[in-house]
A protein has these predicted regions:
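Short linear regulatory motifs enriched in tryptophan with gly/pro/ser
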Residues: 1-184
Length: 184
């Protein structure tokens, strides 16, 4: 009788440290690396993939031992560390910082280690928070309810409040402004 080698899959809940209602649940094989987890977190939270350093920490960001910098292209001293070599147990927590300048911090909690014969595409985002949508302020003035998908940074800086707009209104009224996509 042939035995099937079981693969370990690590299930993490990753939340923005200062907006914990924004979270993603991510599964990754133990044989994959912190570089792979970094890329999935960047994709899940709409962080850019081509710029900015990141790093995982055993405790609080900047106050505890870091696991090595990860460069956007996947290099760096922390990028090749395998998930299954970290000695993690269910409930363990790390912190992750994306962009050392803007200091966007995340809480990374290991929820479960699963033994799996067949492993789906990994890494993968398996769930996320229920979105609490905001609406486009231009459309609201016209009596329409359109979900805002962009923050006009230029207008927000001028008015000292978030100026939230949908895709259409961004193109019509803010096309030459710097804007950032919203995260729900």
């Amino acid at each position: 009788m042939e035995t099937v080698a079981m693969k370990q899959v690590y299930r993490f809940k990753v939340a923005l440290k200062h907006r914990r209602r924004l979270w993603r649940r991510i599964e990754i094989e133990g044989a994959q690396t912190l570089g792979d987890l970094d890329r999935t977190i960047r994709e899940a939270f709409k962080h850019d993939l081509w710029d900015h350093l990141s790093e995982f920490f055993w405790g609080r960001v900047w106050k505890s031992k870091g696991l090595g910098e990860i460069y956007p292209g996947g290099g760096g001293s922390g990028a090749k560390k395998r998930i299954d070599s970290l000695g993690l147990s269910e409930g363990d927590r790390m912190e992750y910082v994306y962009d050392f300048g803007d200091d966007i911090q995340h809480i990374v909690t290991l929820e479960k280690v699963i033994e799996a014969e067949e492993v789906a595409k990994h890494t993968r985002i398996i769930s996320q928070n229920k979105p609490k949508y905001s609406y486009c302020e231009v459309c609201e003035k016209l009596g329409k309810k359109m979900v805002a998908t962009w923050v006009c940074i230029e207008c927000s800086n001028e008015t000292q409040r978030d100026v939230l707009v949908c895709e259409d209104c961004l193109m019509k009224e803010h096309d030459d402004h710097y804007a950032e996509e919203m995260l729900y």
